[in-house]
Each structure stands twice: as C-alpha cells, then as structure tokens.
Amino acid sequence: MRLLLQNPYLLILFALLLTTPSGFSQPTNPRFDAEADLLLSHFDSKTDVDDIHSVAAFATIMSSEPFSQINHHAVAGAYGIQEGLYVPANELFEAAFGERWSDAHTNFNQALSEVAELVSETLETGGDVWVAECGQSDFTAALVQEIQSVHPDLDTSSRIHVVQHSNWNESSATPEKLKFVQGNTDYHKIPDGNAVGNGTPGFNTADSIDWKDSISDPKLISLWETAIAIANRYNGQEGRYLNHNISVGGFDFSDMAEVAWILNQEQMHNAEVFFITFGK
C-alpha cells in the first residue's frame, strides 16, 4: 500500500482493476441471491404518477445484465388509505411484465393468491423474498399473513425482507398493517429516493434527460414512451397529485432506490446515471 501511495500511476491502475466492466458494483456480501430469491415490486399508483415511471424503470433493470435472470413479479394497486384516484396503466404493466404481474386494484384477493403462491414456491425451495415497497404496506401485510397461515413454522422475520424509502408511503398505510409488516418481516427503512447524496440514488429530477441515447432495446424505448404518455395524461388530473418534475419534462422513479438498494446498486447517483447504467 505504501508503494501505491508513493506512485500515483500504480494507484490509478489499482483503482481501475477494482472497477467492473459493466459499471455495476460487485458486493462481497450481496443482499439478494439472484439464483434463489424472489423480487417483488408493489406499486400503489395512487394518486402520484411517479409509479408509472417506476414501472418502466423496474422493467429496465430486470432487462439488463446481470439481472435479467432474476425471478421477479410486480403488483399494481398496492395502495393504503390515501384519498384520490388510482392511475390505470394495465397496458403498461402488460408490456413491462407479461404474465409477471398481478392487479390488486381490480381483484385484491386474486392478486393476493397469485403472489402468495409465488412466495410459497420460493420459500419452499430455500430462497428468500424481497419486497420493494413502492407504495404502502397494506397488500404486503395481507401477503405476510397469508404466508404465515400456510407456513406456520416459518420465521417470516428472517425470510421476507421489505424495503421502504418513503415517509409518505408509511404515513399513508393503514397504521396497524404497517406495524404488522414492520414486526413480522425483515423491514428496512432506507434514505429517500427523491434526493441525491443521502446514501441511496436520487431518481427524481426536473431535468430533461436524453434517455433514448442510452437505451438500445426498441421494446424498452416503446415501454418508456408508453409510461411517459400515461404519466402525462393523468398527472394532476381529476384531483390527482400534481408531480411537478414530471410536468416539466423530468423524471420521477424514486421508488427504484429500493430495488437499487436490494441489488447493492445504491452507489448509483441519479436518474441520468440510471439510464446510462441500465440502458445498455
């Protein structure tokens, strides 16, 4: 190490050797086991349209190497007690995930049954379950209760991991359901994904981004065009929350700070870096 400090050229070479070609970090102790675990993203889509951008961002991550083989599933309509209208985006979920999504807005019980089956399959084969709580914890509470009823001997506090970044999401959940999730899962409250420089990525910006310069997959380009169109259509409409950054042509997929954290990619700085990293 003394030699490295004395020779700046060796120090630069050493730093380059530690940098992975793909741009992704290579953690020594990864949180998520890509070969065994299940990754769930629960979107509320009520009433902020940021979840619409987040759906496209989640699909982008799951399409990229080295994450394209991850077992994943999305849930729409995983909202809590907040007032206001839902943002319908079934065509986006279908384009993003195919059969890998469930509609809790239209049929809560069916969605619960579908996701519980996936969770049980993962747990029974030795994997853990990770939930990116992109909305409130009401659906997750029902899911954990269902798993406990089917697997009464399972310690859900060590096998089901829930990641939440938003104080507002927590305050908009049914209080007793949030408390249940916090007490019956491995619950992680991480820094807010709306800001940069706090330990997680800041995926909320008013800045326009030349995202098409970074994404090469035509399907992903179409997916983002659909997401942007839906978000613009419903943003601030009929009493829905007005997302300022989206209204001026920016981006808000702040919930994806949770997925970045789960996958040990929390060093990613902002939305522009996201597109450069995952759009390859």
Describe the predicted segments one by one.
Residues 18-28:
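Bacterial Sec-dependent signal peptides at the C-terminal "C-region" and cleavage site
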Residues 26-280:
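N-terminal acidic, glycine/proline-rich low-complexity segments
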Residues 5-6, 15, 25:
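Compositionally biased, low-structure terminal segments
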